Swiss-Prot record:
EC number: 7.-.-.-
Protein name as catalogued: Putative ABC transporter ATP-binding protein DVU_1056
Membrane topology label: Peripheral membrane protein
Organism: Nitratidesulfovibrio vulgaris (strain ATCC 29579 / DSM 644 / CCUG 34227 / NCIMB 8303 / VKM B-1760 / Hildenborough)
Gene Ontology CC: ATP-binding cassette (ABC) transporter complex
Ranges of compositional bias, category Basic and acidic residues: 235-267
Organism taxonomic ancestry: Bacteria, Pseudomonadati, Thermodesulfobacteriota, Desulfovibrionia, Desulfovibrionales
Amino acid sequence: MTDTTGNPLLSLDDIHFTYPGTTAPVLRGATLHLAQGDRLGLLGHNGSGKTTLLHIAMGLLRPESGTVHHRNAVAHDEASLAALRRDIGFLFQNADDQLFCPTVLEDVAFGPLNLGLSPEQARERATQTLQGLGLEGFGARVTHRLSGGEKKMVALASVLSMQPTALLLDEPTNDLDPATRQRLIDVLNRMSATHIIISHDWDFLARTCTTFLTVDDGIVCTSRHTPHVHTHIHHGGEVAHEHPSRGCCHQHDGSHHHAGHDDDHPHTSQTTE
């Protein structure tokens, strides 16, 4: 599905949320828009509300107030949320939350079966998706016996097999070894996928995203820091640097400003392998 109207695929507007049993709000009027072609990196400290925001986007949590729109329609009931989930794929931070079938092939074919493909078509699509991620020969393997990194890639395969328009990826590099991490970067860039990625891996974000936002004090704002890849050798390879920008964190209004660096400020290297 391709949106040719210029309207956002996904809009979260003025989202407020507090977890039951707590008094401190996690989100205090957060606004986030994802349009076709956007490649957004979502930054923020642990507990800032990044994952909560994506869970609300997918209908896994309900906000106290604010609205979620999918292609200009309010996503508020099972029918509208089902349409959203067919269009937008979500990778959980913990792969065990996503995988529940005995074998890898069954896990990856589960989504296509739910979309109405025949068992044969679903198996074929699952096999092709696994091959595209470098997971040839994984189909018959028992899912719960995989390593953490292997589970993460199989979980991604289960999302990609549904051929979504956009991706929401929560810490996709967790548990990945360097070679698999690079393969994921290559896959995302080859797909030119519309996505939002949560990650503390600055180098990964610099290589896969073009716009950077921060969740801070319950709102989404233009990022104070921008990851940049510099092609010089540092401990054996290229590294990402963060460039602090001038000013405070300004609340994000749904428009995107592609990040540039500010050479008037010092920068520090940060590796996150």
